[in-house]
Regions:
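Intracellular juxtamembrane helix-capping segments at the cytosolic ends
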Residues: 122-138
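Glycine-rich segments within core transmembrane alpha-helices of 12-TM secondary carriers
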Residues: 63-64, 119, 123, 143-169, ...
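Loop-to-transmembrane helix entry/capping segments in MFS-fold secondary transporters
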Residues: 46-50, 137-150, 186
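Helix-loop boundary and gating motifs at the non-cytosolic
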Residues: 2-63, 109
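Central cavity-lining transmembrane alpha-helices of secondary-active solute carriers
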Residues: 49-74, 93-94, 158-161
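Transmembrane alpha-helix termini and helix-breaking/packing motifs in multi-pass membrane transporters
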Residues: 30-40, 157-183
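Cytoplasmic membrane-interface "Motif A"-like loop-to-helix N-cap segments
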Residues: 74-90
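C-terminal ends and interior cores of transmembrane alpha-helices
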Residues: 64, 85-106
Length: 200
């Protein structure tokens, strides 16, 4: 197995990054916060779905605009580490700020703003992350290595989601003494994802 890598340590770090960042997509974008936004903040599933979709679409447009410039810049200046840390920091802070997404309609603009900014940073971080693989992988094994990292990310997203669901949301006694007032046991998913991202 080791012969498919130039260096096993960068490969491990590469997989751990995928393990660390996937919960953002799983918990914030797809499951927990999307559902919370729909049911607790907006209260109208159809309206909430449209707003959530527009926010994701807007961030996707920004990603398409900025990605080529970011890619060109980091390739020219070899500043991969700086930009990866910056985008990771921004998306982590965005996830953490979702703690303040109280279950009231006035939270709509706040949540959607955080969603656009953090998803933009998350995806741009992915651009930088994907550009790193040729630095340590043998050329004809890049696909295999990318697949292993994706698997690690998929697993990380599931593990984090399970912890949040059964440790905070679907339990009478949420972890760390978190109560259910103002949906604190759901809002904590944001900071938990941020902590997961930073720790790994």
């Amino acid at each position: 197995m080791l012969n498919i890598f130039k260096n096993i340590r960068p490969f491990t770090s590469y997989c751990l990054y995928d393990w660390a960042n996937s919960p953002f997509s799983t918990v914030v974008i797809t499951f927990v916060f999307a559902s919370y936004f729909e049911k607790a903040i907006v209260g109208d599933p159809e309206k909430a779905s449209i707003m959530w979709g527009w926010a994701i679409s807007f961030s996707a447009i920004l990603i398409a605009i900025f990605s080529p410039f970011i890619g060109r810049h980091i390739d020219k200046n070899f500043s991969h580490k700086f930009w990866l840390i910056l985008f990771t920091f921004i998306s982590s802070v965005g996830a953490a700020l979702l703690w303040f997404a109280y279950p009231i309609e006035s939270s709509v603009v706040f949540v959607l703003s955080i969603l656009v900014i953090s998803n933009l940073s998350f995806e741009l971080g992915g651009v930088v992350y994907n550009s790193l693989i040729p630095n340590f992988a043998i050329k004809n094994k890049i696909g295999e290595i990318s697949g292993k990292a994706w698997a690690a990310g998929y697993l990380g997203g599931i593990v984090c989601l399970v912890i949040i669901l059964f440790g905070f949301i679907q339990t009478e006694s949420p972890l760390f003494g978190i109560n259910k007032d103002n949906a604190a046991n759901i809002r904590v998913a944001g900071p938990f994802v941020a902590l997961w991202f930073i720790l790994f």
